[in-house]
């Protein structure tokens, strides 16, 4: 087995940041979902020391998955239930997304994917960094 020259730490869901124009209808209920589904402290847990940063590169997304989910595929099957790159439905919550908001979110998604791709080559190990809530009843762990 060959040794990797670099390690990239993908930290996609550590933020709870949600712009005020996000389109969600019930912010109080959404806040509960954000608290449950944010991968709390992964941006800190997977943050290498300065000495290691030449070989271990953290890449974190600055917004909540409820604004843009950078771990979805461009044509993700979950889009059919409102949980693609731009969530429109989650449990009982609904989000109105106009063309302007969708385009903005897709640009954020593409920017993150491009940034992540810049760090990756055939000698790179990509590690997907997550945490899970103590109640795992709703969590799908592969």
Please name every model-derived segment.
Residues 1-126, 131-142:
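N-terminal catalytic or cofactor-binding beta/alpha core of small enzyme domains
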């Amino acid at each position: 087995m060959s040794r990797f020259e670099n390690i990239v730490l993908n930290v996609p869901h550590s933020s709870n940041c949600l712009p005020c124009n996000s389109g969600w209808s019930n912010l109080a209920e959404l806040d509960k979902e954000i608290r449950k589904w944010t991968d709390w402290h992964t941006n800190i847990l997977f943050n290498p020391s300065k000495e290691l940063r030449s070989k271990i590169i953290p890449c974190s997304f600055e917004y909540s998955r409820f604004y843009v989910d950078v771990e979805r595929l461009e044509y993700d099957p979950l889009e059919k239930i409102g949980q693609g790159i731009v969530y429109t439905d989650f449990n009982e919550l609904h989000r109105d997304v106009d063309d302007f908001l969708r385009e903005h979110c897709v640009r954020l998604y593409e920017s993150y994917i491009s940034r992540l791709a810049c760090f990756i080559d055939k000698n790179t190990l990509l590690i997907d960094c997550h945490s899970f809530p103590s109640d795992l009843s709703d969590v799908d762990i592969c």
